[in-house]
Regions:
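Structural signature of the two symmetry-related core transmembrane helices
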Residues: 102-116, 199, 314-329, 410
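Juxtamembrane intracellular "pre-TM" segments in multi-pass secondary transporters
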Residues: 5-32, 216-256, 434-439
Length: 439
């Protein structure tokens, strides 16, 4: 999904005028302050979210007695809700005149509200409702946040900018399970204590967003290449958002994101398999996401910068090849703690080579005024596909067992990667114009 950008970007003066946080005659900042502020918000929010994510599978399966099929249904429905809301969030942000912060703030606020409500969720219906609202918040904020990153960064540096943001986000993912582990070990309230602390951290993330992220980002990042065409006075309509799929480059990205999403096992299922195959004690389960997050953090920025210089789509496909190797290790006769660590290394490398890559690629083929909707379209396709994968994998696990279900998924991933390589082979990163969208 990282698409190579080898074109020249014009004179130094043009660059300085187009990119925020720069002065004429000086080299523009590779990572604008807006990206760093959004990274701080994501870091804090991810500490809160990953505290819950780290204990949720065991809480649902061991605490509430839900079967793998039931957990797959719960996980899939929640991802599906977030996917459907994501499109609305991106469109509303664009329609408001690029007021992406307002929509993103609503999303962060909803998620923060849900954390203390988990204290009341001791039955499956209540838990499902709370998680659905939490996913609604995540769906609302994702596209506007990525649109702000795209608009604040010059095209040649988007891979690095998204890499920095994802690295900060992953720092939160790294700290969240550690904090959950510490809370579980230090308190007698167990899961309730984790949910309470998570809610307090989420509120802090909302405060950082309100205080440090600018309300409106006016810089047209695509002006680095050429002056932007005159934009119509009317706000983008919903049909304009759907009409983005007329753009062949965006359509290819969406198709491939969905195709590969259909064969990407959710983290929760993968960690459950690792815990069972590696015979890990239950209290170590929250540490499994830690290994993934650690290598994601180490590699996100260098791989993002590499994608800016080489090819975003090739790096994205290579990342799925790494994931396929991870599936192979889980299915291999090699078990125990070393095998678990090796799988987590590959899993983290997969995320470093793919997460944020899709957003960087999307930003390069969508007009500035449609950034929110463009990010939402591709993200929705991917999330809906992962929703279907969670349902199918949970059913397959219940029918055939976890190992057989993973073997089938791995074979499907290999086929999907080959097809995606063919579809993306001619993809180029040339931003479309508003006229092309409305045509």
């Amino acid at each position: 999904m990282y698409l190579a950008d080898s074109r020249s970007t014009g004179s130094r003066g043009t660059e300085a005028a187009a990119v925020p946080d720069t002065r004429p005659g000086r080299r523009p900042a590779a990572v604008p302050s807006t990206v760093l502020a959004l990274g701080a918000v994501s870091l804090i929010t991810d500490v809160s979210s990953e505290m819950v994510t780290a204990v949720l599978p065991l809480y649902v399966v061991a605490g509430l007695g839900l079967s793998p099929l039931g957990f797959g249904l719960l996980d899939g429905i929640n991802n599906g809700v977030g996917a459907l809301v994501r499109l609305a969030g991106g469109h509303l942000a664009d329609r408001g005149g690029r007021r992406h912060k307002v929509v993103a703030g609503l999303g962060y606020g909803l998620s923060a509200l849900c954390k203390p409500l988990l204290l009341l969720a001791h039955t499956l219906p209540v838990l499902s409702a709370v998680l659905a609202v939490d996913r609604t918040g995540k769906g609302l904020r994702t596209a506007p946040r990525d649109a702000m990153i795209s608009l604040a960064t010059e095209p040649a540096q988007r891979g690095r900018a998204f890499g920095v943001h994802r690295a900060m986000d992953t720092t939160g993912a790294l700290l969240g399970p550690l904090l959950a582990f510490a809370v579980l070990r230090a308190t007698v309230d167990g899961y309730d204590a984790v949910f309470a602390v998570s809610g307090c951290v989420a509120v802090l993330g909302v405060l950082v967003l309100v205080l440090f992220v600018p309300r409106r980002i006016d810089t047209p990042a695509d002006a680095v290449r050429r002056p932007p065409p005159p934009e119509p006075d009317r706000p983008p309509a919903l049909r304009d958002a759907i009409g983005l799929l007329r753009l062949p480059e965006l359509r290819r990205l969406t198709v491939c994101a969905a195709l590969l999403g259909l064969t990407t096992v959710s983290d929760s299922f993968l960690y459950l398999l690792l815990q069972r195959e590696g015979d890990l004690p239950a209290h170590l389960f929250p540490l499994l996401p830690l290994g993934t997050a650690a290598f994601f953090l180490l590699l996100a920025v260098p791989l993002g910068a590499l994608a800016d210089r080489v090819s975003r789509r090739r790096l994205f496909l290579a990342g799925h090849g790494v994931l396929l190797l991870g599936y192979g290790l889980v299915l291999s006769p090699w078990h125990g703690v070393p095998a678990v660590i090796a799988v987590l290394v590959l899993h983290g490398t997969f995320y470093a080579a793919t997460d944020g890559v899709l957003a960087a690629a999307t930003a390069g083929v969508v007009p500035a005024r449609h950034q929110g909707a463009g990010q939402a379209l591709v993200g929705t396709g991917q999330a809906l596909a992962r929703f279907a994968c969670s349902l199918a994998f949970g059913a397959a696990w219940s029918l055939w067992g976890g190992r057989t279900a993973l073997a089938v998924t791995a074979a499907a991933l290999a086929v999907s990667a080959v097809v995606s390589a063919f579809v993306l082979r001619g993809t180029d990163e040339v931003p479309a114009t508003t006229d092309e969208v409305s045509a």
